């Protein structure tokens, strides 16, 4: 790996570390410490996806029009620092201020969505180092530092939260964002070459069949993920899984992120050997199986095993949908293409936890939330099944 590529990989690691230091405890923290309802918790978690949904297409187009990548990546690190520093302030005032803290958490969580929107430019910045025919390989490679950093971030974040308090976990994220900002600031930009970007070229990009395929599958994947492992599984575990404690909050996401990171590294090879029309539906079927089993995974080890199944499914889906979105797009249009792809799946990131929160409240009986959680898991299993069928139909050979 060349020195420049190593620097980008390091920046990717710090980027996702700064964003994922606190999601492992955010929803349970919002309910227990900030007094947020299930719906408000869903909004706090979902604001991350909503802001991405709004910003990613404009950001992708802007990076292609201005032919700049680096400045938008740096803005992303800045937004991540603002988000985590703001949440640290909210944590400092928790228990001392009367009301309004959940709303402030919602606002600052939105800034983390603005940070994640810059993944549009950072991922394209990395893929520019590979020829078009090796895009799937590049996306498989980039997935490992992305998800491995999330594993480390969630473990350390939960540990720091339990030992020192939530405010210190948020400040850890701020420090990682600053380190990443300094690292990327030393790099030279790698502007795309080609014809000037126009509205006509954007329409041409948005109509690309592979981009549409990747985006449709990604939104279904994100709906399921953000309603479960990235949303309410931690709340479910704290309430109904025997032997689960606050000490396990950091371990819980690791049990899906680690297999996700490992499997992602080999997904391109599996796709070449067996075909995307097999690997992608298989990934969705694994997600569906995990969702169906959650209501019965009321033992700590069964829950962890279920998280592993979910993580393997994720690892089979993410690199291939991401590669599909840009592999047939010229380099000077990839910012717009990645913006479309990530904006579309941002709908799932926002809608997943919001809909899940409403389903949980609607199907719960008073203070007993078991029925609500079970209904949410069944809903997600159904969405995953739709994803499996869609993946087979959209990727089969014609």
Feature names for model-found ranges:
Residues 1-2, 188-216:
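Juxtamembrane intracellular "pre-TM" segments in multi-pass secondary transporters
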Residues 55-68, 263-275, 360:
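Helix-to-loop junctions at the C-terminal end of transmembrane segments
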Residues 162-175, 358-383:
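A membrane-interface helix-boundary motif in multi-pass transporters
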Residues 78-98, 286-298:
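C-terminal ends and interior cores of transmembrane alpha-helices
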Residues 65-77, 272-284:
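Cytoplasmic membrane-interface "Motif A"-like loop-to-helix N-cap segments
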Residues 13, 98-117, 302-316:
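Hydrophobic core of transmembrane alpha-helices in multi-pass small-molecule transporters
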Residues 1-49, 213, 223-237:
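Helix-loop boundary and gating motifs at the non-cytosolic
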Residues 108-145, 324:
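Cytoplasmic helix-loop-helix junction between adjacent transmembrane helices
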């Amino acid at each position: 790996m060349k020195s420049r590529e190593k620097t980008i990989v390091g920046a990717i690691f710090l980027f996702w570390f700064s964003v994922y230091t606190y999601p492992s405890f955010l929803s349970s923290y919002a309910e227990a410490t900030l007094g947020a309802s299930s719906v408000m918790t869903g909004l706090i978690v979902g604001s991350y996806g909503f802001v991405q949904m709004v910003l990613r297409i404009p950001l992708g187009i802007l990076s292609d029009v201005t032919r700049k990548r680096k400045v938008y990546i740096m803005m992303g690190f800045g937004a991540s620092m603002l988000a985590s520093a703001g949440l640290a302030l909210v944590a400092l005032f928790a228990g001392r201020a009367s009301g309004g803290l959940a709303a402030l958490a919602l606002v600052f969580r939105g800034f983390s969505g603005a940070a994640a929107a810059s993944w549009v430019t950072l991922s394209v910045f990395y893929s520019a180092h590979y020829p078009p025919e090796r895009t799937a390989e590049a996306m498989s490679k980039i997935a490992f530092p992305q998800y491995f950093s999330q594993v480390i971030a969630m473990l350390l974040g939960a540990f720091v939260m339990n030992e020192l308090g939530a405010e210190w976990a948020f400040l850890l994220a701020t420090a990682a964002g600053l380190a990443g900002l300094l690292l990327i600031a030393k790099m030279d930009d790698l502007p795309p070459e080609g014809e000037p970007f126009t509205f006509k070229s954007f329409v041409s990009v948005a109509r690309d069949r592979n981009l549409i395929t990747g985006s449709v599958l990604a939104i279904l994947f994100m709906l399921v993920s953000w309603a479960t492992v990235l949303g309410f599984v931690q709340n479910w575990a704290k309430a109904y899984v025997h032997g689960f404690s606050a000490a396990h909050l950091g371990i819980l996401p690791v049990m899906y992120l680690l297999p996700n990171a490992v499997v992602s590294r080999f997904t391109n090879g599996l796709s070449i050997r067996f075909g995307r029309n097999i690997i992608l539906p298989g990934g969705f079927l694994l997600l569906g199986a995990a969702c169906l089993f959650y209501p019965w995974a009321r033992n700590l080890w069964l829950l962890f095993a279920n998280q592993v199944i979910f993580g393997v499914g994720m690892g089979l889906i993410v690199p291939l949908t991401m590669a599909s979105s840009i592999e047939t797009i010229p380099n000077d249009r990839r910012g717009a293409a990645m913006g479309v792809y990530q904006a579309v799946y941002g709908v799932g990131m926002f809608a997943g936890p919001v809909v899940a929160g409403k389903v949980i409240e609607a199907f719960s009986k008073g203070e007993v939330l078991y029925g609500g959680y079970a209904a949410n898991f069944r809903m997600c299993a159904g969405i995953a099944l739709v994803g499996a069928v869609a993946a087979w139909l959209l990727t089969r050979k014609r």
